[in-house]
């Protein structure tokens, strides 16, 4: 019985695989679909290339606009740098004059101050002792106050900050040069990408409609008949002048030169003579000492005013001959130059802040441009790679053939499309399976196959 069983088993297996093999009708349907693959595929390729060329055109337009914005930024940066250098130069000149005046004043003021200080200290301490008993505390306060006056007149103020270091300017210059180099290279890359895409356009120009040809070859300043690609990422920018509102530092120089000396004179007169003006009711005080009119119980308001402000001691300078006009005539230029130097330093700080802000805006503008360019190149740049392979759309879809394959007896899911890509790609051939839900005779298969082939080709170009 064993031989008959063996024969029956072989026969049943043969029938099974015979039933699963493709019929002539199904094979003819697959071959018929493949004959229409070049026509459908070429239409898809033309549409995808057209979309990519529109994206490349938009990228070129965007880059040209970005170049204009970058040029305005660099112009503003150059102007701000010149203004900053002028502010630095002005501050250096004031500092040199201040140092010269301090050296001259220091030599002459020491002797005069040594003669003025004892008399001024004596009168002031007597007054403050009468107003506020406590010799040690009053004497300590007086020494600190007089020491501040001497330090202000004989040496540079400790509050004056050093001018900005030259190394900082050099570092900023290097940063600007780096930004300029990156942006220039980005512009070159964008132009190169467009040139390669333009070569593809010339190859396929006859396949495109007249409106698209006019658009792609038109000047970028004309109206655009096609909506911009990546419209969500490219937003309208405000005018640079309205957006930043950079003040004119040269105008600040002019205003500074007109007002600083007037303010300095007012500050000096206020500091040295304000108390003297309020002293008119008490001119009857003589140089021999304090009278009963200055006692706390009779002049409480005056004592309270002087205790709150030790600069009231300067009122007694008229009691001493050597102190009479010391602060206003001995070294009049030193206080004025100190204030002028502080004003110049403030101007330098303002110009440095403006320069830093424009550098930051330029850096942000560069980073934003790089981001947009990368996004657009990622989406549309694949078309430029066709230029180095001399593609012909017919070759892509003519080099195809059906490969029958057995799939567990389901003849409607057996076919695959093999694409010979050696004519346009260095990679080996690849196959595309029929969609699971469609049979070989379905008309939807050809569109599915064409889309898969095009997707594969685009993926290969995008990785290069």
From Swiss-Prot:
Pfam families: Clusterin (PF01093)
Disulfide bonds: 105-331, 116-323, 119-320, 124-313, 131-303
Name assigned to this protein: Clusterin-like protein 1
Family assignment from sequence similarity: Belongs to the clusterin family.
Signal sequence bounds: 1-20
One Gene Ontology molecular-function label: misfolded protein binding
Organism: Rattus norvegicus (Rat)
Coiled coil: 56-109
Annotated GO CC locations: extracellular space; nucleus
Keyword set, alphabetical order: Coiled coil, Disulfide bond, Glycoprotein, Secreted, Signal
UniProt-annotated glycosylation sites, renumbered to this chain: 195, 255, 309, 349, 398, 429
